[in-house]
Structure formats: C-alpha cells, structure tokens
Amino acid sequence: MELQLAIDLLNKEDAAELANKVKDYVDIVEIGTPIIYNEGLPAVKHMADNISNVKVLADMKIMDAADYEVSQAIKFGADVITILGVAEDASIKAAIEEAHKNNKQLLVDMIAVQDLEKRAKELDEMGADYIAVHTGYDLQAEGQSPLESLRTVKSVIKNSKVAVAGGIKPDTIKDIVAESPDLVIVGGGIANADDPVEAAKQCRAAIEGK
C-alpha cells in the first residue's frame, strides 16, 4: 500500500519544502490542480528537481488533447499524471499510451463518474495504472466520504490499482486502510496539520498496520 501527499494550496517553493520534510513517509508527492492553475507545469518541474526517492504526480485532471497534455507533464518531470474518468474513451486510451511509452503511469480520477462499477470495469480493461475514487471538496463539505465508492471499485477491477482520496486524515485513515486500497491519498490531513511530519508518520504507520 502506497501513501501520497496531495499539496494544493501552497506555492511551488513551499510545496517542495513540505514534501522534503515528509518524504521519508510518502511514496508519491502530488502537485495539485490549484498549484498547476496558479503556477503552471514549472511547479511540477520544481518539485521533481528538488526531491528524490519519491514519485511526482501532476494532478492535471485532463479532459481532452490527452496525449499532448500527458507528454507536457512528463516533459516537466511528472511520473504520474491524472485524467478524468468522465473523459472520452479515446482520450483515456491516448493518455495511457503516451504515459506507458515513456514508462510513466496514469491515474484516472473518478470524480463525478455516475456509474462507478461500469466505468471502473472499462478503465481496468483499457489499462489504467490507478483508478482513484475521489470525494471532492464540495461533496466533503456535505459530509460524504469515499468509503462506499472504494468498496464498489475494488469489487470489480482485476488489473488496475485502486487509489482513494477525499478528506482522509490521520484519525480516519484506518477505516480506509481496512478496505485495502493500493494507494491512499492524503492532502490537508498532512499539509494543514500543526505538525505535518507527525501527521505523515501516523499515516505511514496506519498503512503499515502499526
């Protein structure tokens, strides 16, 4: 089981500083969509240039022109790139092909997908590396969690890894870990903690069953 730190609300310098503080406890560091909107792909490059021994994910949330956008993210140092599960099949297939020919990985974000079971099966057959169930900020505010969606997707896929994101914190991560996802994505639960290093350490301990 892997742990990913999602960083959304910092500038690229502070993001790299935070990532380096917690890198002993995480496998993947994400440059979140808000940072990419604010600072562009150079934020991904800054992270890739300033951290070692962890993968860098660019949360592009691609919807179209997929092979080009994947290739650009890779050019700027991304190891993992995200595309939306609601994108056209042709876009997702092109994104997977572009990532794989560069020995990189593609994560498909299931935010706003209505028929999770059907789409997860399709994405699994397409060869997505990760299928991520994601309760976004707006639904978290309504009290929703990704647990049920995680169970649904895990029950139908055969090859892809299952990732889970959405309001996960050190004090709630054990409920998620109990469902055995392949990748647990924690954002504010680490980034906004009073002691991010301790929060990351607690999350790592939870996924290792300690």
Curated annotation (Swiss-Prot):
GO terms for molecular function: 3-dehydro-L-gulonate-6-phosphate decarboxylase activity; hexulose-6-phosphate synthase activity; orotidine-5'-phosphate decarboxylase activity. Keywords: Carbohydrate metabolism, Lyase, One-carbon metabolism. Pathway: One-carbon metabolism; formaldehyde assimilation via RuMP pathway; D-fructose 6-phosphate from D-ribulose 5-phosphate and formaldehyde: step 1/2. CDD domains: KGPDC_HPS. It is an enzyme of class 4 (lyase). One of its GO terms (biological process) is one-carbon metabolic process. Its EC number is 4.1.2.43. It catalyses: D-ribulose 5-phosphate + formaldehyde = D-arabino-hex-3-ulose 6-phosphate. NCBIfam families: RuMP_HxlA (TIGR03128). Catalyzes the condensation of ribulose 5-phosphate with formaldehyde to form 3-hexulose 6-phosphate. Belongs to the HPS/KGPDC family. HPS subfamily. This is 3-hexulose-6-phosphate synthase.
